[in-house]
Amino acid sequence: MSDHTGDNEDNGKLLYCSFCGKSQHEVRKLIAGPSVFICDECVDLCNDIIREEIQESTTESTGDKLPTPQEISETLDEYVIGQKQAKKVLAVAVYNHYKRLRVGDKKKSKDDVELGKSNILLVGPTGSGKTLLAETLARLLNVPFTIADATTLTEAGYVGEDVENIIQKLLQKCDYDVEKAQQGIVYIDEIDKISRKSDNPSITRDVSGEGVQQALLKLIEGTVASVPPQGGRKHPQQEFLQVDTGNILFICGGAFAGLDKVIRDRSEKGGIGFSAEVKSKDSGKNVGETLRELEPEDLVRYGLIPEFVGRLPVIATLDELDQDALVRILKEPKNSLVKQYSKLFEMEGSEVDFRDDALEAVANKAMERKTGARGLRSIMENVLLDTMYKIPSEENVVKVVVDESVIKGESAPLLVYGNNDAETAKAVPEE
């Protein structure tokens, strides 16, 4: 411990930190104990050390137990409605991926089989739950997670984001801990938007389509990426972080509008001549049923290059959500919209009552807009706007009733007032 003394204007003694030896004039705060002192900088350092040790011990205690595919699927059920087959495919793929990492951490013998990485492609209509599935998986496994938008990516040297910026975002999520980032999950959204216009090789330079697919190949398969620590474009004077992407799980997702037609064209192809099998053009299948017949060759025909499709061996297709599924999404998940709005109104000392016909009307509106589950919140916000504007200023509102006529815009939500004598009700006047 440091034992410095000197002259001070007040008491003739200059105080020093017993740990780092800095004087009271060199630090912002000096805390006194029995015959010792500690400065604010040393307190911060101690807090950081304790925090790191707690995180390490937590990781070690939970790291041994990897949830089984069935447990993963059951957890996904709490947040995502329907999509049973997609959940099963995801659960098995993610379980095998992290089981592979556990094997990789142990010492390998000469005869050990090397397990390859299986990245995932999610194909489904907009608002069917692709992003939510990936987010829930990352939260369940307690690994770093980031979402990248494929439409903003360009080849290196062109205006736009380099593909390495995806890894830089992942590093940001885990405070630039490279080891942690190397076991994370990256979700690349709108992957269908980087498809080339035809399945023939492009003659002209396609810097945001086929060029991006080429740039993503090595990153997805596994390479040591040089990432600028503060993001942005690379320059020679900058030091880079080296991140091995070989153990990062890449999940790519896209709506692939028109892919069902590509699948139908392939499956309905017949021979020629009298013995050719004649197939009906209208089989009555919906988009979800058609997507289940997806083959890698359909993705190539759609505009993904064969090498890119080969890097995504696990394909999970999601069904289009029907009205019943949308109603269930509104009220069943842990973070459902009904529960969220109930909590918001509860904070104002009142409750909100969504009638069943109201939820069906919301689901019906979302289906008409073809926005899937993503459009549910905007409908609810629009319907409850006036009510949420007035409630904080009103007194004694104990209940808000929302029925089908409110969703259709025919009437306003009913406010129930609690008085000492009885309860009275009136509609919210429109602005």
Swiss-Prot record:
Keywords: ATP-binding, Chaperone, Metal-binding, Nucleotide-binding, Zinc
Alphabetized InterPro entries for the sequence: AAA+_ATPase, ATP-dep_Clp_protease_ClpX, ATPase_AAA_core, Clp_ATPase_C, Clp_protease_ATP-bd_su_ClpX, ClpX_bact, P-loop_NTPase, Znf_CppX_C4
Stored PROSITE patterns: CLPX_ZB (PS51902)
Pfam families with a match to the protein in the record: AAA_2 (PF07724), ClpB_D2-small (PF10431), zf-C4_ClpX (PF06689)
Signal peptide: none
Domain (ClpX-type ZB): residue spans on this chain: 5-58
SMART domains: AAA (SM00382), ClpB_D2-small (SM01086), zf-C4_ClpX (SM00994)
Family matches, as Gene3D superfamilies: 1.10.8.60, ClpX chaperone, C4-type zinc finger domain, P-loop containing nucleotide triphosphate hydrolases
Cellular component, GO, one term: HslUV protease complex
Entry binding sites for Zn(2+): 17, 20, 39, 42
Gene Ontology molecular-function annotations: ATP binding; ATP hydrolysis activity; ATP-dependent protein folding chaperone; protein dimerization activity; unfolded protein binding; zinc ion binding
Chain sites annotated for binding ATP: 125-132
Keyword Zinc: yes
Gene Ontology process terms (BP): cell division; proteolysis involved in protein catabolic process
Subunit structure: Component of the ClpX-ClpP complex. Forms a hexameric ring that, in the presence of ATP, binds to fourteen ClpP subunits assembled into a disk-like structure with a central cavity, resembling the structure of eukaryotic proteasomes.
Family, similarity comment: Belongs to the ClpX chaperone family.
Purpose: ATP-dependent specificity component of the Clp protease. It directs the protease to specific substrates. Can perform chaperone functions in the absence of ClpP.
Protein name: ATP-dependent Clp protease ATP-binding subunit ClpX
Native source species: Saccharophagus degradans (strain 2-40 / ATCC 43961 / DSM 17024)
